Amino acid sequence: MAAAQGPVSCEPDTRVLGTYLSSVPIGSMGSVGSLVEKQDLSPLELRAPLGGTRGLRQPDGLLRKGPSQRELFGYLHGAKKETRSERKHQASAACYKRDYESDRENRSPERCSREHHRGADFSKSSLPERGRFDKCRIRPSAFKAVTGKGLVSMQGLSSSKGQKLSKSNGSLHTLLSQSTTAAPQHGPLRTHLLHAISLDEASDSSHNSIQSFPSYGSRLKPAQSQFSASMGHINHIGGSLDRVSRSPRDPLAPEKAPLSCKSMATLSRLQSPGEPPPPYEFTYSLEDAVKQLEDRLKETGGELRQLKRSLSETEDPFAQAFEDKQRLWLDELEDLKQMYMARLQQVTQQAQRGQRALQLQLYKAQQEKKRLQEELSMQQCQCEETKLRQSQGERVSPKLEETKWEVSPLLSLSVATLQAVQPGWGSGSLL
């Protein structure tokens, strides 16, 4: 079956499946058909024929399904006419837009519109080489049981009004796995959505059987397990989801890596009606993770070096001024030390000179003392001698007085005698 797998928000609806079971005649035999794949195109390129992109996200946080099979078939065949219901649906969904990365410039809508002016070319010359994975190729379909109705376009298989095609084969499971990782309590919701999309795919496969060729008259009733359409599946209308899932991403920020703009219309075949397809998970190699960590480490190291450099540049003037002041203070301290050492030496010399002078004076005083002591001793000796002499004179004076008194009468007698004897001699001598 050809269905675009992706996150859906609608409830599972099995009415189409019941309708298909009731409408399949017994012994009807399908026809051989083929489906030509086109090159990868972005959702913006689908906007011109489809009338705008679908809203990618619903209010409950889940992604919507991609375009319906009718719209995809109309784009592949270059259909320009749109039904009234499609216009209404396109007008209601025209408000949803999405910004894509700048590296998608080569796949911009303007450039694609200039390069692809016409619709799909299904001629033999347009078919790619065999084995080329990135280009369209024809896949034969198996013989399946289809109804015997008239010619119906291969892609004119519209799903029910409450159903929408999913975005890609693995986007639903990828987003559900991411939402389960972020919020583990939503496990039952994920299981319910997986079951709903599997039932939806089964109903789409039963309802969208290929009816583009007349049926044959075989009356063999096909088994109910063979409800998948005999149209193959389109892998590369937006098939870059596989390449995106295998491309290296940042393991630290997986939410920053948007899905490829071409994964909007990815169609893949449902392998079993009862089980969901394997999810597409984003895998990161160890080398990429190590490289990302090394890059971030280098960036952090560069920022640290820049901070150190700026800090050193900021501190350099203050450090230089402090060093200059410290050097000046050391020089002043050394000068003060030298000055006070010189003063101390000078004072010491002065003290030594004063000490020597005092010692000399003391010696002189001691010598003078000795001299004075000697003189004193001499004076004392002389005084004692004088005292002795005085004492001796005091003892001689009375004797002299006595002698005077004894001699004076004698003298007077002698004189009188002489006068008497010689009267003239005595008077002349006395005169």
Swiss-Prot record:
InterPro entries, per database record: N4BP3 (IPR033571)
Tree of life domain: Eukaryota
Keyword Coiled coil: yes
BP GO annotations: nervous system development
Main localization category: cytoplasm
Gene Ontology, cellular component aspect: axon; cytoplasmic vesicle; dendrite
Region (Disordered): 48-127
Comp. bias intervals (Basic and acidic residues): 79-89, 96-127
Keyword Coiled coil: yes
Coiled-coil residue spans: 284-390
Compartment(s): Cytoplasmic vesicle; Cell projection, Axon; Cell projection, Dendrite
Keywords recorded for this protein, A-Z: Cell projection, Coiled coil, Cytoplasmic vesicle, Developmental protein, Neurogenesis
Function statement: Plays a role in axon and dendrite arborization during cranial nerve development. May also be important for neural crest migration and early development of other anterior structures including eye, brain and cranial cartilage.
Similarity-based family: Belongs to the N4BP3 family.
Protein name per Swiss-Prot or TrEMBL: NEDD4-binding protein 3 homolog
Organism: Gallus gallus
Lineage: Eukaryota, Metazoa, Chordata, Craniata, Vertebrata
